[in-house]
């Protein structure tokens, strides 16, 4: 997971810039709608909704917008939120890099067409369901900041049924667990006074394709940026790592 986390750190820097875009507000609002639709519209009893709300607040989405999204998901605003569905698309990027795209859409034909164009114009191709998902494992991830003592983090992580952790930056760690144990892990870490900046479910590549050429990196990152810019796309995950010199070239 080391290389993936290295790139994930750059992605988080990029997210600070992307968070200023209206499309990110739309994505986070849709995540709240789906979470409220799939469970009860009360964050205290709906972990998926609670984490979606936390992400929205971290991005600066006003409380009124959050409450409206919850109401849409609960069906109390008479909206068409019931037409939204979660779909995972799969494909390949330049150099055979495997790519997973998670979308929320009210028109799967439109979304598939948009994705197909994005892939084909940027050196990739949209594949069939299952063509690359076997290369990834879904994990729960807690991002912890202000880690001053790794032994304390390890102890708390074990109590919370974590599988592993990794220091990805100075005093910043990612703690991994089974998806079913994510709520327990996050609650345990908080109870031990660790600061969690994000709690999420993430696709983790089992193996990675090393990107060592700048031209391939440019094509791949252009494809990912294009995919992430589509209105229906919630997240994009790929099984690549980059050489340090290339990462520095694209750092913000």
Task: Please annotate each region the language model reported.
Residues 143-252:
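Positively charged, low-complexity, intrinsically disordered RNA-binding extensions
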Residues 1-127, 132-141, 252:
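N-terminal cationic and glycine-rich segments that engage phosphates or anionic surfaces
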């Amino acid at each position: 997971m080391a290389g993936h986390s290295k790139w994930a750190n750059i992605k988080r820097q990029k997210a600070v810039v992307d968070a200023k875009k209206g499309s990110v507000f739309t994505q986070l609002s849709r995540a709240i709608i789906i979470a409220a639709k799939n469970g009860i519209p009360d964050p205290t009893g709906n972990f998926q909704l609670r984490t979606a709300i936390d992400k929205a607040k971290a991005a600066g989405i006003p409380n009124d917008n959050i409450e409206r999204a919850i109401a849409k998901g609960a069906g109390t605003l008479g909206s068409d939120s019931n037409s939204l569905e979660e779909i995972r698309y799969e494909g390949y990027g330049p150099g055979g890099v495997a790519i997973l795209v998670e979308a929320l859409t009210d028109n799967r034909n439109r979304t598939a067409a948009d994705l197909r164009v994005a892939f084909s114009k940027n050196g990739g191709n949209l594949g069939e369901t299952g063509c690359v998902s076997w290369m990834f494992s879904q994990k729960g991830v807690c991002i912890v900041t202000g880690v001053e003592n790794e032994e304390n983090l390890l102890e708390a992580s074990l109590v919370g049924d974590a599988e592993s952790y990794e220091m990805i930056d100075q005093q910043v760690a990612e703690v991994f667990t089974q998806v079913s144990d994510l709520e327990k892990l996050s609650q345990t870490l908080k109870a031990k006074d660790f600061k969690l900046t994000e709690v999420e479910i993430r696709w983790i590549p089992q193996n990675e394709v090393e990107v060592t050429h700048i031209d391939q990196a440019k094509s791949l990152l252009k494809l990912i940026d294009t995919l992430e810019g589509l209105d229906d796309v919630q997240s994009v995950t790929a099984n690549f790592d980059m050489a340090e010199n290339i990462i520095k070239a694209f750092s913000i």
